[in-house]
Amino acid sequence: MDDLARVLVAHPFFAELEPAHVTFLVGCTKNVRFRAGDHLVREGDREDTLYLIRQGGVAIEMRRASGEVVCVETLGAGDVIGISLLADAPAHLDCRARESVVALAIDAACLLRKMTEEPSLGLPIAMRLLERTYERLSRARLQHLDIYR
């Protein structure tokens, strides 16, 4: 297993995948860095990358009708950005580095192609993406309830 495969399998999102599946994804993956203030994703952009955060923090932000930017969630090491790539829809939030960020960037088209070619890989990844989506929606719901008490 090469270095990039080791880094992939060490991330919680892929921790339980079979080594052969991780090796299968290495060709879709590269290491990336962002400086504080850099956008990983902008509202309205196509989500063409799945980011696995290794170090640093990312603010998930939205704009109110007034133009005010509100941080709705912060993510850090072990978290994932780009979970809606399966929906093939534009991003509805901004994702901005709060500090220096080190991440793995997985090309969405390559990932989706590999998921289709290898269903024993595709289903576990789709399930992980759905789990992350559910977790985020649950946290957003709790935040919303807390605001209106």
Predicted regions and their residues:
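Cytosolic regulatory regions built on CNB/CRP/Popeye-like sensor folds
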Residues: M1-R149
